[in-house]
Design a protein with these regions (language model features):
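Active-site neighborhood of phospho(di)ester-bond hydrolases with catalytic His/Asp-centered motifs
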Residues: 70-73, 93-101, 121-124, 181-184, ...
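Active-site metal-binding motif and surrounding structural segment of the metallo-beta-lactamase
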Residues: 77-122
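C-terminal regulatory/interaction regions
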Residues: 2-7, 22-30, 37, 268-302
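Active-site environment of divalent metal-dependent phosphoester hydrolases
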Residues: 55, 103-106, 127-129, 165-166, ...
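Conserved beta-strand hairpin/beta-sheet module of binuclear metal-dependent hydrolase folds
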Residues: 7, 23-25, 29, 34-86, ...
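Structured catalytic core of nucleotide-sugar glycosyltransferases
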Residues: 48-58, 100-109, 127, 158
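Cap/insert and terminal regions of metallo-dependent hydrolase folds
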Residues: 191-292
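Metallo-beta-lactamase
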Residues: 123-178
Length: 302
């Protein structure tokens, strides 16, 4: 009996040690302040994830010559409210970059485009899908997937990503010696995707689900589970970690995990999986944060 108790205590001690190490990793990686606030810094580039998850995605990038949204996946009212937390308004936007036509990326697009006459940037297939889905004609500024163009002092590099939309894209924004990569909604990472974001200083990458939580979820039909797990679905926590390991360089300084499923993932789980991988590959220079659905992240000023 004593031997059994000693063995149990030993296993408990090991478990506590492992948990303590993981907690330490998470604390080290999550260096951002806890609350969003007004943009007051004089540095040239600001990034605010206004919200990210299965119910809506929207990010804000500000430079001296551009104020851009990447997707508009919340209602126009919600986007206005979230911009207000950082002292900004939709009226001052330079344009909106659209990754693809799914509703969690375009919910507020019609009202923003109609009322404010904002430029909408997307490719031809996405533009056609927008007209059909929103039941209204939206004038879009078209680009060819794989091409580059400029908005003020921002060079926008586009590239194809594998997702079940018409012609989904990722973005790499280059401005003022800063490179910001956006990788959400993709079922796997191709060599092209990895090549395009390898030079990023900031990476927003989806960690949509934990595979076991998804498989066990009683509210998801099997057909939906197959779609999410497929090669044109969404990245799991482990798949996101694999991708980051592939592209890791000393240039990558900040990372946001986005598009987390409320039912099939947990922020602390996604963060722990990525933090452990960063620790394993010696990437202690990367500050890791998890984007939330309901509140903006603190602004990152670069």
């Amino acid at each position: 009996m004593r031997a059994q108790l000693a063995e149990i205590r030993g296993e408990t001690s090991k478990t506590q040690t492992r948990r303590g190490a993981i907690d330490k990793i998470v604390r080290l990686k999550n260096r951002c302040p806890p609350q969003p606030g007004l943009i007051t810094s004089n540095v040239p580039v600001h990034l605010t994830i206004l919200g990210s998850g299965s119910a809506g995605n929207c990010a804000y990038v500000e430079t001296p010559e551009a104020r851009l949204l990447i997707d508009a996946g919340f209602s126009a009212r919600q986007i206005r409210q979230r911009l207000a937390t950082i002292g900004r308004t939709p009226e001052n936007l330079t344009g909106i970059l659209v990754t693809h036509e799914h509703i969690d990326h375009i919910q507020g697009l019609r009202i923003l485009a109609e009322k404010l006459n904002l430029p909408i940037y997307c490719n031809r297939a996405t533009s056609d899908a927008l007209q059909y889905q929103l039941k209204v004609k939206i004038e879009c500024r078209l680009f060819a997937t794989g091409g580059c163009f400029e908005i003020g002092d921002v060079q926008v590099e586009t590239f194809s990503i594998p997702h079940d939309a018409q012609d989904p894209v990722g973005y790499l924004l280059r401005t003022n010696n800063v490179k910001i990569g956006f990788l959400t909604d993709l079922g796997h990472t191709t060599n092209l995707v990895l090549q395009r974001v390898r030079s990023a200083n900031v990476l927003v990458i989806e960690a949509n689900h934990d595979v076991k939580m998804l498989q066990d979820c009683p509210r998801r039909p099997w057909s939906l589970k197959q779609r999410i797990l497929g090669r044109h679905g969404h990245l799991s926590n482990d798949s996101a970690a694999d991708a980051v390991q592939e592209i890791m360089t000393s240039d990558l300084r900040y990372m946001y995990l986005g598009h987390l499923s409320r039912e099939c993932n947990k922020p602390e789980l996604a963060q722990t999986v990525m933090a452990q991988r960063l620790e394993k590959i010696g990437a202690n220079h990367v500050a890791l944060s998890v984007a939330r659905q309901d509140v903006p992240c603190p602004t990152l000023s670069l």
